[in-house]
Amino acid sequence: MDNFKYIYGPIPSRRLGLSLGVSPIPKKFCNYSCIYCQIGVTHNLTNTRREFFPLEDIINEFKRYISSDKNFDVVSIVGEGEPTLYSKLGELIISLKKLTDKPIAVITNTGLLYDKNVQEELLNADIVLPSMDFFSQESFKSLHRPYGRLDFQKSYNGLVEFSKKFKGELWLEVMLIEDINSSKEDLLKLKELIKNINYSKIYINTAVRPPAESWVKPASKETIDFAVGLLDGISIDNLSDGNFISEIKDNYEAILSIIKRHPMNQHELKGFLLGRKLTNKEIENIFLRLKEDENIEILEYKGFYTYRLK
């Protein structure tokens, strides 16, 4: 059990607990190029839904992962791009639910929720976490830099429509960025739009890891606190506690498997390697290898050095 292409983690999540990731999308295939994206700038912009990887391969790998007793709280379909671009998303959700009694969550940027097929497929999930941090076409374009003809009203209307028929848990995610959607006026506009959505929880977040664009400013604590009060939300504007886990046996490959989907800072990396019983010398050698790897970028942000795949 030392080679996993689609399954990663589990990783500690501020919302979901210990989250086992399923990634049905290749690296940085998305219909947005969000300024705050923690895995960097989108390389492949598209609105075309495809079966990027064979559904059977993903399911077989998941079966292999759970063949021995593993500890995780939820299965999250997310990863390296926008999961609703996967044309067999509905079948993937249904297949996973047949194999585990843990909830199946889908994290989406909301862009394709106007598509009736996407809506129908997502109805099979237990938890859907859509982004809802825009309140106008201008804010939509500034935050997400959407591809093609995606627009604010279309995506918003799709989210409202989906929320009326979804029977699971809908957890809205509001990412606040200073000077773009963080003013009192912005948040009041957002509140008016959110009133039309049937949701269970609303999470208030900001850029806690290095964003795609270095000029992005995280929202202040005062802004976060105001938004939490105004929207009756839950603040998650800090890093997760807990250790990362991987079933990949090779230590370096295990790190790569995680950071191409979820960047890690130096403390998280060290904790991960200590959990795998490495000596200080072995850990030092891995950090040196990461530093010399031309496919990895090391970014200083908020007092941490964060490692992610280019």
What spans do the regions from the language model cover?
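Short strand->helix junction
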Residues: K27, N44, E82-P83, D179-I180, ...
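Canonical Radical SAM [4Fe-4S] cluster-binding loop centered on the CxxxCxxC motif
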Residues: R14-D57
